[in-house]
Curated annotation (Swiss-Prot):
<dbReference type="GO" id="GO:0031522">
    <property type="term" value="C:cell envelope Sec protein transport complex"/>
</dbReference>
<dbReference type="InterPro" id="IPR000185">
    <property type="entry name" value="SecA"/>
</dbReference>
<dbReference type="GO" id="GO:0008564">
    <property type="term" value="F:protein-exporting ATPase activity"/>
</dbReference>
<dbReference type="GO" id="GO:0043952">
    <property type="term" value="P:protein transport by the Sec complex"/>
</dbReference>
<dbReference type="InterPro" id="IPR001650">
    <property type="entry name" value="Helicase_C-like"/>
</dbReference>
<keyword id="KW-1003">Cell membrane</keyword>
<keyword id="KW-0067">ATP-binding</keyword>
<feature type="compositionally biased region" description="Basic and acidic residues">
    <location>
        <begin position="929"/>
        <end position="940"/>
    </location>
</feature>
<protein>
    <recommendedName>
        <fullName>Protein translocase subunit SecA</fullName>
        <ecNumber>7.4.2.8</ecNumber>
    </recommendedName>
</protein>
<dbReference type="GO" id="GO:0005829">
    <property type="term" value="C:cytosol"/>
</dbReference>
<keyword id="KW-0811">Translocation</keyword>
<dbReference type="Pfam" id="PF01043">
    <property type="entry name" value="SecA_PP_bind"/>
</dbReference>
<dbReference type="InterPro" id="IPR011130">
    <property type="entry name" value="SecA_preprotein_X-link_dom"/>
</dbReference>
<dbReference type="InterPro" id="IPR044722">
    <property type="entry name" value="SecA_SF2_C"/>
</dbReference>
<keyword id="KW-0653">Protein transport</keyword>
<keyword id="KW-0963">Cytoplasm</keyword>
<dbReference type="InterPro" id="IPR014018">
    <property type="entry name" value="SecA_motor_DEAD"/>
</dbReference>
Length: 940
């Protein structure tokens, strides 16, 4: 199906390119006019364009003039003029497409075109990059273009305070990473004051390296979490010791391809003997099964120095695609704790999910979305089906001259690396720069030792020295340089022959203590001279590099994804430069070993083929392409499945977040509370009386429950007397009497506290209850999804079952929210205090057991996806924000809060009575909790 869709998508490419070429022609016709404008006149173009847009002209109509203005501003500030193909790429982005542009075609510069045009609407434009460094670098460099046009730029970085973030989002164009934008969206929907929210909507986004962000990282959601009750850490340590004693193929079996393990009967017996239990699979022991499976996975599937490294007593994940250490990232589902126990380091506690969204659903919030990458063609069908984004291949500015050599395959890894070293040494001696791509930290260090032994000077870029990453990449095009890198996906820094002049110039300016933000005038004054000097030196060296053959890219192993291989190759041959690429493979490489059908091994097994002799075979090439296709199809199916299930939760999230936003924006909480009161009384009546009359009802039980809900003032006898007799009391009559009494009690409560204090109490209670119940609902939905796959064994569609039961859980949650809200509003002990000062808005109230504001910031954890199945976890302080800063932020929140709360747990503690607010309020007592549903599942 995908192949048919891809063919259909390609049919309209010619028509689209002609449309883009017409835009480029229109911009070219205006170029001369704009060159004659003064700097002030150029800046005033923005004012004029905004006025025209406000008067009804569409952004499409303004495109030629806006693009011409950006081209001229870039020429004046950066000395870079947009090529026609870059104009075409910018137009493709503005029209809501993915522009497929080869490496080195200037994607960063292209993004300025649609960013400026859409910023004319004054609704904010987001430019999404792959890391904080690039966000800061691009906002600094491209900010010079936007400032020349009278527009402001911002950058969102980890560690910024809410006030700093709000200021950055207020800019016309804001740069940042997908994780930061996504977390701000979640935090905004956890805010307790409208003034605490930082984003101002989702109008238009340009996503750089769009395939990496929207495809590779789409499987795992963004999660904000906080500490959870209980401590299971001792079990991780216990089972790590158990796993050490289990023997592969005797006690358990492993499927490396599917990344699964299975415990055999002998293994189960050993575990039961070790723990002193009779049956591991008894209901009381079922929680232990996940500890066992995770411990075996940690032992068998996760390898030290390949999948992770241990540094300073911590287990740090290594990104399989980029080779970077993913600081703070953690595998989910208990895998990371199992690895920590395996390595004998401190096991960190698990957290409870407070808010979550997948990147797929976050980016679908934008009114218009676009993206750039050099390798989107292989995923065109998925981009269209998931994001409604077309892929438009943009022609290169100059013809590609890179020579892509055929793969060389060796019998074993030792022979392969020996030939790799020989090839590198020869090219290094000739002055040709070499970029070597490896698939793991272990392989890069192994190759580094071989090169050192050979006497070849080189730089190593991997997870253990990523702090120098950008500087190393920028120098990788120098004469005779050799750079060993653990995969090059998402590096984001151009490798230019002779060196990256822009990067080197910015570094030189920073060395002088100059910043475009802090010293803008001096920065602009000195930039031209510094850049000209650096550019001259780079150009002179580039000529020598071209003579030596350009950049040579050498891959030491094929990756599971063709896109990653293409990204590595694409580092060479930018902008028509000469270059060359080749992959060296062996039959023991992971991809060949896991997916090889045996044809290659049969071919290489002949005695006539020595170890140090390579073969070039179409059979092997086909086997590799087939293996990569299998992996890509499997990953695409996983992403598709994740989206289907998350769409269920997404609709619920939109309802809850919409409710919260209305509350923060001044929704009539008195009217909402009255609706809640009516609904709760209806629920109580439904549970105690039927359709008959008073002769059949248990009035005592009904009144007992009503007393726990609100201070009921009417008696049973009064209701019966009013009706005339017990038999004449029907449901409508008793409902009317009770509701009238409840509303009277509510009015008395408001009179007692005062109108302003009552409104504030309503806001506090509703937000607190919604947030807590939503957290518990996320917990329940997560558990439901974990086991829903088993329904297939009963010939039921797991997705349909998940939708049905998820809706039922949502309805239960909404009922619990109404019930708890009413109970708290009537029963909380509230002390009303006078305003702190003349500037305070309304009275201050103190409600015992009710949170003063949202979850304590310094206890939150931020979890982000990685394309290898791991997750990134940062605390509020992180590596960038210091503890003092986090404390200052927390103090500021407490100071700014309208309410003052006691230093108690944020979970509201309700009156000791009935229902959701009277019983223990943890997940263990929530309707359809885990243990109850386990029993229900076993019955099914």
């Amino acid at each position: 199906m995908a192949s048919v869709l891809e063919k259909v998508l390609r049919v309209g490419e010619g028509r689209t390119l002609r449309k883009l070429q017409n835009y480029a022609k229109a911009v070219n016709q205006l170029e001369e006019d704009f060159t004659h404008l003064t700097d002030e006149e150029l800046k005033n173009e923005t004012v004029e364009l905004r006025e025209r847009h406000a008067n009804g002209e569409s952004l499409d109509d303004l495109l030629p003039e806006a693009f011409a203005a950006v081209r001229e501003a870039s020429r004046r500030t950066l000395g870079l003029r947009h090529f026609d193909v870059q104009i075409m790429g910018g137009a493709a982005l503005h029209l809501g497409n993915i522009a497929e542009m080869k490496t080195g075609e200037g994607k960063t510069l292209v993004a300025t075109l649609p960013a400026y045009l859409n910023a004319i609407a004054s609704r904010g434009v987001h430019v999404i990059t792959v890391n904080d460094y690039l966000a800061s670098y691009q906002s600094e460099l491209m900010g010079r273009v936007f400032r020349a046009l009278g527009m402001t730029t911002g950058v969102i970085l980890a560690g910024q305070t809410p006030q700093q973030r709000r200021e950055q989002y207020a800019a016309d164009i804001t740069y940042g990473t997908n994780n930061e934008f996504g977390f701000d969206y979640l935090r905004d929907n956890m805010a307790w004051q409208a003034s605490d929210m930082v984003q101002r909507g989702h109008f238009f986004a340009v996503v750089d390296e769009v395939d990496s962000i929207l495809i590779d990282e789409a499987r795992t959601p963004l999660i904000i979490s906080g500490p959870s009750a209980g401590d299971a850490n001792r079990w991780f340590t216990e089972f790590a010791n158990v796993a050490k004693r289990l023997v592969p193929e005797v006690d358990y079996e492993v499927d490396e391809k599917k990344r699964t393990v299975g415990v055999l009967e002998t293994g189960i017996e050993k575990v039961e003997d070790h723990l002193g239990i009779d049956n591991l699979y008894e209901s009381a022991n079922t929680p232990l099964i996940s500890f066992l499976n995770n411990s075996i996975k940690a032992k068998a599937l996760f390898k030290k120095d390949k999948d992770y490294v241990v540094m300073n007593g911590e287990v740090l994940i290594v990104d399989e695609h980029t080779g970077r250490i993913l600081m703070g990232r953690r595998y989910n589902e208990g895998i990371h704790q199992a690895i920590e126990a395996k390595e004998g380091v401190a096991v960190k506690a698990e957290n409870q999910t407070l808010a979550t969204v997948t990147l797929q659903n976050y980016f679908r919030l934008y009114k218009k979305l676009s993206g750039m990458t050099g390798t989107a063609e292989t995923e065109a069908a998925e981009f269209m089906s998931t994001y409604k984004l077309g892929v438009v291949p943009i022609p290169t500015n100059r013809p590609m001259q890179r020579k892509d050599q055929s793969d060389l395959i060796y019998k074993n890894e030792k022979a392969k690396f020996e030939q790799v070293v020989e090839d590198i040494a020869e090219r290094h001696a000739a002055g040709q720069p070499v970029l070597v791509g490896t698939t793991s930290v272990e392989k890069s260090e192994y190759l580094s030792k071989l090169l050192a032994k050979k006497g070849v000077r080189h730089e190593v870029l991997n997870a253990k020295n990523h702090a120098r990453e950008a500087a190393i990449v920028a120098q990788a095009g120098h004469l005779g340089s050799v750079t060993v890198a653990t995969n090059m996906a998402g590096r984001g820094t151009d490798i230019m022959l002779g060196g990256n002049a822009e990067f080197l110039a910015v570094a030189a300016m920073n060395a002088r203590g100059l910043s475009p933000v802090e010293t803008p005038e001096q920065y602009e004054t000195e930039w031209d001279d510094v850049f000209a000097q650096v550019k001259a030196e780079v150009d002179e060296e580039a000529a020598k590099v071209i003579e030596a053959g350009g950049l040579y890219v050498l891959g030491t192993e094929r990756h599971e994804s063709r896109r990653i291989d293409n990204q590595l190759r694409g580092r060479s041959g930018r902008q028509g430069d000469p270059g060359e690429s080749r992959f060296y493979l062996s039959l023991t490489d992971d991809l060949m070993r896991l997916f090889n059908n045996g044809a290659a091994a049969s071919l290489m097994g002949r005695d006539s083929v020595p170890d140090d002799v390579a073969i070039e075979s179409k059979v092997v090439s086909r086997a590799i392409r087939s293996a990569q296709g299998q992996v890509e199809a499997r990953n695409a199916e996983i992403r598709k499945n994740v989206l289907k299930y998350d769409d269920v939760l997404n609709r619920q999230r939109e309802a809850i977040y919409g409710d919260r936003r209305h509350i923060l924006e001044g929704d009539d909480l008195q009217e909402r509370s009255q609706r809640f009161l009516e609904a709760v009384i209806d629920d109580v009546l439904d549970s105690h009386i039927g359709e008959g009359n008073g002769d059949d009802w248990d009035f005592d039980a009904l009144w007992t429950e009503l007393k726990t809900l609100y201070p009921i003032s009417i008696t049973i006898d009064e209701v019966i007397t009013e009706a005339g007799s017990k038999g004449r009391v029907n449901r409508d009559f008793v409902r009317r009497e009770i509701l009238s009494d409840a509303k009277l009690a509510y009015s008395k409560r408001e009179e007692q506290l005062g109108e302003a204090a009552m409104r504030e109490l309503e806001r506090r209670v509703v937000l607190s209850v919604i947030d807590r119940r939503w957290r518990e609902h996320l917990y329940e939905m997560d558990y439901l999804k974990d086991g829903i796959g088993l329904r297939a064994m009963a010939q039921r569609d797991p997705l349909v079952e998940y939708q049905r039961e998820g809706f039922a859980l949502f309805q239960q949650m909404m009922g619990a929210i109404r019930e708890e809200t009413v109970g708290f509003l009537f029963n909380l002990e509230v002390e009303v205090q006078a305003p702190a000062d003349a500037e305070s808005v309304g009275p201050r109230i103190q409600a015992k057991g009710l949170a003063a504001n949202q979850a304590t910031a310094d206890k939150l954890r931020y979890t982000a996806p990685t394309d290898d199945g791991g997750v990134e976890v940062r605390n509020q302080r992180g590596q960038i924000e210091k503890a003092a800063t986090a404390k200052a932020q927390k103090d500021q929140q407490a100071e700014d809060a309208v309410l003052v709360g006691e230093d108690e747990p944020e979970t509201p503690q309700g009156p000791p009575a009935r229902g959701a607010f009277g019983q223990p309020t943890g997940a263990s007592s929530a309707p359809q909790n885990r243990e109850e549903r386990r029993k229900a599942d076993r019955r099914k």
